[in-house]
Amino acid sequence: MRSFRIFLAVVSALAGTTAFAQAQAPVQFPEYQFTVVKENPVTSVKNQHRSGTCWVFSALGFVESEVIRINGITDPAQYPDFSEMFVVSKSYYERGIKYVRLDGCLGFSAGSEADDVLDVIRDYGIVPQSVMSGMNYGTELPVQGEMDAVLKGFIEAATKNPNRKLTTAWKNAYKGILDAYLGPCPEKFTVDGKEYTPASYRDALQFNPDDYVSLTSFTHHPFYTKFAIEVCDNWRGDEAWNVPIDELVEALDNAVMNGYTVAWGSDVSEPGFTRNGMAVLVNTEAKQTAGSDQERWVGPAFDKPAAKPGKKDAKKEAKPEVKQPVEFVVTQESRQEEFDNKQTTDDHGMQIYGIANDQFGRKYYMVKNSWGESGKYKGIWYATEAFVRGKSIDIVLHKDALPQALKDKLGIK
């Protein structure tokens, strides 16, 4: 996933214009009361901080929940905590090799996809956070701008091939940068008195990356076939099954209600995705009356009607009740249009682990983020079904979490 900071930088640059400021006015939400319908186990909320690594934090959180489910772990004290930076190191190394091989015709950045995590676990294994924290550069939380820039500078220099023949040293030098910032990837380590390699530890956890599938939903490829989603961070070209959006949501619901969590890739640049734990696909057209004569008399679309000017007693004036924002109605066609015109982009990776309803009866997905215990819900977001329908790039889930009818259509055993 590309860093959400890019979007924030654009917001900062444009916020000085009146039109933009009006269009992006903060969305008002009522005081929600959520009732949990289904909630599956997740590990603690982590903090990717100043790094573009949401993809690994979200996907490893998903893997941790899968290990909990597969092994029947009920004691939170025994929940696994895997090393994000082990995966980052392996992924960055392979990406650099491919970048040079393709003469630089490949996206090279900190961003990637959930499937990349499964690929690394399949090829190398996995290690606990306790044996590789990845924090070798003097900060308590990830701050990786320098590392990203140094890696890119090195790999671009190697790609230019100034000697007209690549030396035998460049791969070791590149790996040396990764080791300097993240620490060497352990070849052996001990857990509970037993020695493991990354691969044997993966196997001991009974986690099989080949048991997982990716789903997406776009019309520029045939349904019930696989294709590599055309986003820069999908540098491996991993493929997802293309299904109608109704069936993707049905698969998501089936997974959650049957004890599975889901890795979720989504656009988060909508004004209804807030830093206070909400993800609502707000119909911004309902806010275009701001400052108009209509608003003067009847109030904004998402508030109670305003009283007539000059008739209010300031001492008795009550704050208007904030109602549910109106959401866009998502169709298969609207999803495709927004993907094609870059209104839906590959922004952020998260983990969906539950379903809840608010006091108005609206359905939400419970989402674990990787921005620390921030916001009103301490690192948890509540995403409406409309938001998930409209803004999802893909989901990753266990194949047994799929409805049987969809498994049959895809030929998945």
Predicted regions and their residues:
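Residue-level marker of positions within ordered structural domains that often coincide
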Residues: A9, A59, Y92, I121, ...
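Active-site signature of cysteine proteases
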Residues: N172-K413
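Bacterial N-terminal signal peptides
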Residues: L8-T18
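Boundary at the C-terminal end of the N-terminal hydrophobic targeting segment
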Residues: A19-A23
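Short, glycine/serine-rich, charged loops/turns that create anion-binding
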Residues: L14, G61, V268
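Bacterial N-terminal signal peptides that target proteins for export
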Residues: M1-L8
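Short, flexible coil/linker elements and helix-boundary hinge sites characteristic
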Residues: G16, N71-G72, G411
